[in-house]
Amino acid sequence: MKIRRVVTGHTPDGKATVASDTEVDAITIRMLPGTEFHRLWGADEAPTFPDAGSSRSAPAYFPPVGGFRFGVFTVGPDSVAMPKDLDLQVALAELEDKLPGIASRLEADNPGMHTSDTIDFEYVLSGEVWLELDDGREVQLRAGDTVVQNGTRHAWRNKSAAPCRVVFCLIGAHRR
């Protein structure tokens, strides 16, 4: 699935303008069937205005302090199994290639559980998903619900039969 992304910027004389109007393809990962990532915008530092609205470099999935990421991810149902012929090393290499830095945050002994040095703002667009925290609590979220995560250890679990779409904004933060 593609998502349309309209980006504004400034002309040389300071007027607002549409800098780009494009479609962003989903990033899919073989080891995460039913899951999609749309990396819509991001930067590794705070922007300065006026600017032309051009895309900034933001290669890593998680932003550094002062950086940000904006996107949509689709959490596939937990019932959709990984392919039986999956080569784990090849799959991890694909994950690192398509979403740099995310694999190092995932816990091998607890699939999906991860921690990042970010404050995460999430809004559930459609479907339902469970936010699992490391104290054992699970919070069911449905379309219209929001989450603010403050660098917490968590996982997303989709116990339903339908995909769940979530809009997110990650902002890099300090951890003591």
Stretch-by-stretch model annotation:
Residues V6, H10-T11, K15-S20, D25-I27, ...:
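Double-stranded beta-helix
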Residues A108-R142:
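A short beta-strand-loop-beta hairpin characteristic of the jelly-roll/cupin
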Residues E23-V24, R56, F70-S116, N150-R153, ...:
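Conserved short histidine dyad/triad with adjacent acidic residue
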